[in-house]
């Protein structure tokens, strides 16, 4: 069985590009950011949204196996078809786990040795994500705090669900980014 794929959808937040130039109909990702100091330019600004990605049932099944959360609403298509959702849905924590990869689709962060998760606040799973749905990440850099060897970032994250006025997920995400050593 072939998994459905998301159609190409042009981004609408291109006026946030550093140059200020809008490029109609072009997905302008990833944005190149040069080192942890380059993040300063994006403080209090939203990055252009990432590309749409399909979340296939195979990913949901793999997440169920990896975590042991095999609740039928995630893995039993026949039973889920008769549920309030009408199909299987992704685990909320699977949707949450997509955040780092979605940011990498938005940003090419150069001269950074590594990034690590520091925490997640105010996570809300707003809209269920059906198997085969198209999602994309939207990120706003709200705070930068210097730390030894790098910077702590505070992002407001919104994972959009194609065809829904409400997001699939909203959260505050804290990471630590460490500069390359000279």
Question: Where in the sequence are the language-model features?
Answer:
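Hydrophobic beta-strand-centered segment that forms part of the acyl-chain substrate-binding groove
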Residues: 83-87, 94, 100-138
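Catalytic strand-loop segment that frames the active site of acyl-thioester-processing enzymes
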Residues: 17, 24-90, 107
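Generic structural detector for well-ordered beta-strands
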Residues: 48, 52-54, 124, 174-176
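HotDog/MaoC-like acyl-thioester-processing domains
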Residues: 2-41, 128-182
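A generic structural signal for short beta-strands and their flanking turns/coil linkers
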Residues: 49-51, 59, 69, 112-121, ...
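Predominant activation on well-ordered alpha-helical scaffold segments within soluble catalytic domains
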Residues: 61-64, 96-100
């Amino acid at each position: 069985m072939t998994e459905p794929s998301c159609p190409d959808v042009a981004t609408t937040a291109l006026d946030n590009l550093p140059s200020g130039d809008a490029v109609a109909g072009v997905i302008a990702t990833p944005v190149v950011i040069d080192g942890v100091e380059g993040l300063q330019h994006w403080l209090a600004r939203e990055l252009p949204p990432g590309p749409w990605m399909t979340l296939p049932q195979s990913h949901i099944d793999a997440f169920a196996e990896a975590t042991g959360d095999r609740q039928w609403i995630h893995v039993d298509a026949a039973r889920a078809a008769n549920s309030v959702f009408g199909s299987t849905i992704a685990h909320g924590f699977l949707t949450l786990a997509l955040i780092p990869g979605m940011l990498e689709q938005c940003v090419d962060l150069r001269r950074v040795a590594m990034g690590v998760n520091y925490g997640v606040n105010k996570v809300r799973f707003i809209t269920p994500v059906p198997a085969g749905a198209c999602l994309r990440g939207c990120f706003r850099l709200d705070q930068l705090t210097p730390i030894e060897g790098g910077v702590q970032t505070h992002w407001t994250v919104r994972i959009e669900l194609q065809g829904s006025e409400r997001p699939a997920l909203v959260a505050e995400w804290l990471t630590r980014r460490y500069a390359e050593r000279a």
